């Protein structure tokens, strides 16, 4: 709800332009992107509990400022503060689960977190529209205050203070060194990079043509700044907000591609489908929310179900692939909706699409937990969430362009006596008052065609997400149990790298038992990150972390020696 763009501090109903600008370029989005990556570092440098509570406090303060804003300037400033705070909330929740639950159980809990996130993404704007139409837009922000207080109390009372004190050796650094770890150079360059890209995608094809000098200049400057950002990240090394060693890992970049595309598809459907109900079926904001329940329920149920299935099967890559396929098919079916489509169609299509998003959206965060050592998990989580959020922003901007251009061309082609600019400036429920009754049928057809065209964007992005899903390595969230006899010691399990877990784990086990005196004498490609009686080892050839239980690996070592 707090993401809904409010151009004026008044009590007018949300217009189509307001809804289409739900996630465009603005200061909150820019600072949100910055904050997401920054929190990846901050969670390594400071205790997760207190960073999460501070982020929540900033979000609450920003919401309070927005709700009480006497002018648009106050609203903008409040959204900046809220954006800085909200950037650390979802990543913090994921990391808190990672601290208290073993890897094989995190899929289920992350599934529930993802289900709630999906519900909020769809229901939030609809509730915001209802508040704006029936009460006041300020309630969109004030409602966050009691919810945030309850969350803060729960985290404060139930999460121990020093549970992760040994998580990262950098936590003992002085403040000056910690500031150097934050990669301020990269952050400074990233701000104008994001602004240029978002402005170009938002203005191109609407305010200016794609060939306009302003749009070309924005893309060129954005590209140059992006190159500069990459150079800075390489120069900064492990201090970078996006460390090159992290980007090289197949799991990270494959999950980033997948999340960028699938979440972009999800947001396009989430924000244009309610418009279809309001414009074509004559729903109010509240009614469109009710008719959108099949999508919400589909995403929620299958998100939890996927988490349980990953917990049982051990693998998550299959869920990403299945999610891409179902989402692409579901979005394609939604693009066939007509003015006279019956309930069976729009309910069934929503359930299918929701199932795809439910299966796929949360798995990249599980993949990060399975593939990365502890000291990189917060940064890896932040990168994936950043790409997810950025992908949604770009997809919405592209879909907005498609809708605006198609609607204008349809209105002109149908000869409907209405100003397209005036049509875009009113709410979707106010269409009948714009034209004479004999033209309303043609207006509905023009609107239907324009909205369903945006679902092609959802089809394309869901289809592209498959490129990322099939590249995500098949790693298991279950602990590897070593065979008891030497004959089967080298047996390769399905989807397992041919290198045995003994080969990978032995240096770490020997170091732990004192048989190797110095860690420096071993290859730097092997990292020891103990947790929950596990030893995590990293093989540079596979670029993944493989885990084995200390006890079972000792048995395998003994078996080989014999």
UniProtKB/Swiss-Prot annotation:
One of its GO terms (biological process) is transmembrane transport. InterPro entries: MFS (IPR011701), MFS_dom (IPR020846), MFS_trans_sf (IPR036259), Sugar_transporter_CS (IPR005829). It comes from the Eukaryota. Glycans are attached at residue 448. Induction: Expression is up-regulated during the late stage of P.nodorum wheat leaf infection and is controlled by the cluster specific transporter elcR. Residues 533-554 have a biased composition (Polar residues). Its main location: membrane. It is a multi-pass membrane protein. Residues 515-562 are annotated as: Disordered. The keyword Membrane applies. Belongs to the major facilitator superfamily. TCR/Tet family. MFS-type efflux pump; part of the gene cluster that mediates the biosynthesis of elsinochrome C, a perelyenequinone phytotoxin structurally similar to cercosporin. This is MFS-type efflux pump elcC. It comes from Phaeosphaeria nodorum (strain SN15 / ATCC MYA-4574 / FGSC 10173) (Glume blotch fungus). The gene is elcC.
């Amino acid at each position: 709800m707090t993401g809904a763009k409010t151009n004026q501090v008044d009590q007018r109903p949300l217009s189509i332009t307001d809804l289409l600008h739900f996630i465009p370029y603005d200061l909150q989005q820019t600072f949100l992107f910055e904050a997401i990556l920054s929190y990846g570092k901050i969670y390594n440098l400071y205790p997760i509990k207190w960073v999460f509570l501070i982020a929540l406090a900033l979000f609450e303060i920003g919401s309070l400022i927005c709700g009480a804003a006497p002018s648009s300037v106050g609203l903008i400033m409040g959204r900046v503060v809220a954006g800085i705070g909200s950037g650390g909330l979802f990543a913090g929740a994921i990391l808190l689960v990672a601290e208290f639950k073993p890897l094989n159980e995190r899929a289920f809990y992350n599934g529930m977190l993802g289900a709630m996130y999906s519900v909020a993404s769809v229901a939030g704007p609809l509730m915001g529209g209802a508040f704006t139409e029936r009460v006041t837009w300020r309630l969109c922000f004030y409602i966050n205050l009691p919810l945030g207080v309850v969350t803060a109390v729960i985290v404060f009372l139930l999460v121990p203070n020093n549970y992760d004190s040994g998580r990262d050796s950098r936590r003992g650094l002085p403040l000056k060194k910690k500031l150097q770890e934050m990669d301020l150079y990269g952050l400074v360059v990233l701000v104008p990079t994001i602004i240029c890209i978002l402005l170009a995608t938002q203005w191109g094809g609407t305010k200016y043509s794609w060939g306009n000098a302003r749009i070309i200049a924005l893309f060129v400057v954005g590209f140059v700044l992006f190159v500069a950002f990459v150079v800075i990240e390489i120069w900064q090394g492990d201090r970078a907000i996006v460390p090159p060693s992290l980007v090289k890992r197949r799991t990270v970049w494959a999950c980033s591609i997948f999340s960028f595309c699938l979440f972009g598809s999800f947001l396009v459907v989430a924000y244009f489908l309610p418009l279809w109900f309001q414009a074509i079926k004559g729903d109010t904001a509240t009614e469109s929310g009710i008719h959108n329940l099949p999508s919400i329920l589909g995403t929620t149920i299958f998100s939890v179900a996927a988490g349980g299935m990953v917990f049982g099967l051990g693998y998550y890559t299959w869920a990403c692939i299945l999610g891409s396929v179902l989402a692409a098919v579901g979005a394609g079916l939604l693009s066939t909706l007509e003015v006279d489509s019956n309930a069976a169609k729009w309910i069934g299509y929503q359930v299918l699409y929701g199932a795809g998003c439910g299966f796929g959206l949360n798995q990249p965060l599980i993949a990060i937990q399975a593939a990365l050592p502890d000291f990189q998990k917060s940064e890896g989580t932040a990168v994936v969430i950043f790409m997810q959020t950025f992908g949604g922003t770009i997809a919405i901007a592209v879909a907005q362009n498609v809708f605006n251009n198609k609607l204008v061309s349809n209105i002109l082609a149908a000869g409907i006596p209405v100003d397209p600019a005036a049509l875009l400036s009113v709410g979707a429920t106010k269409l009948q008052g714009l034209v004479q009754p004999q033209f309303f049928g043609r207006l509905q057809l023009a609107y239907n065609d324009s909205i369903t065209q945006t679902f092609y964007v959802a089809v394309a992005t869901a289809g592209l997400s498959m490129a990322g899903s099939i590249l995500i390595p098949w790693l298991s969230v279950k602990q590897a149990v070593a065979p008891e006899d030497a004959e089967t010691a080298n047996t390769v399990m399905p989807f397992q790298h041919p290198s045995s877990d003994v080969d990978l784990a032995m240096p770490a086990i020997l170091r732990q038992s004192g048989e190797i005196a110095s860690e420096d004498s071993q290859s730097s490609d092997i990292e020891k990150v103990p947790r929950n009686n596990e030893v995590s080892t990293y093989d540079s050839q596979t670029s993944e972390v493989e885990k084995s239980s200390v006890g079972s690996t000792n048995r395998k070592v003994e078996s080989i020696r014999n």
